[in-house]
């Protein structure tokens, strides 16, 4: 058995965890700033966001293209596509940041409804997710929602799976994976709902097979346009792990997956959906800090119910769409 530094004090959070049969809060999670690795990950994320913003601004306005850049911005702001994407981006990021899932599913559904191909939809969502998951991940870390050990175990396999999925979806239609993934998620959603209403078994061991789970989750996320949160978060939460720290860790790891898959998409295909990407980013940036705060304040049982209900509803909807196609 792996020895873990648990906070066993009698505080409101641990009392609720005891009633639900969830693990006690871990001391490293309560004090995330003491971990150099998490601090380095936060700084890397912030630097990537700044560098990408400067790069895109340079592509828009340089060299000596201020008039053309302002014209493009004006046309984008006056278009209905941009503001529709803003609304979708805000809603999708609130759901994803607070529950750890469904940003890709929500946003991809919108893009597919506009006529975009699965490859273009997935590319647009993952490029936008670089910004939204970056801000959300930093917020989760600051609120103490990230478990360093779990985050590290998710990182490399998840990145590898996302890169492989991005390569596949540019060659084969990723929609063929949807029926199988949706059926799997529906069963997990039902299982999570049952956990919220019965005594859970206390777990003190680290979750098993996290690397394999992250590899699969990253793959279906890039190939199908969404699924990292539903696959990884629901599996870990349904195994009896703390919803708050699981959501925060999975959400922060998603930034690095989005960065890797977006790089592969940029190399293998061209996309002209920048107004949609800009709208998703703009809406998501406003929602990310609010979602992390919501995750911090909601009770564990409430999170279990919300996660289970959301997964069941989305899985039924996606399964119906996939089978009716």
PLM segments and residue spans:
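Intrinsically disordered, low-complexity non-transmembrane regions of multi-pass membrane transporters
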Residues: 1-45, 53-75
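Small-residue-rich hydrophobic segments that form or flank transmembrane alpha-helices
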Residues: 3-23, 70-75, 82-158, 210-223, ...
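Alpha-helical transmembrane segments of integral membrane proteins
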Residues: 40-43, 83, 123, 176-183, ...
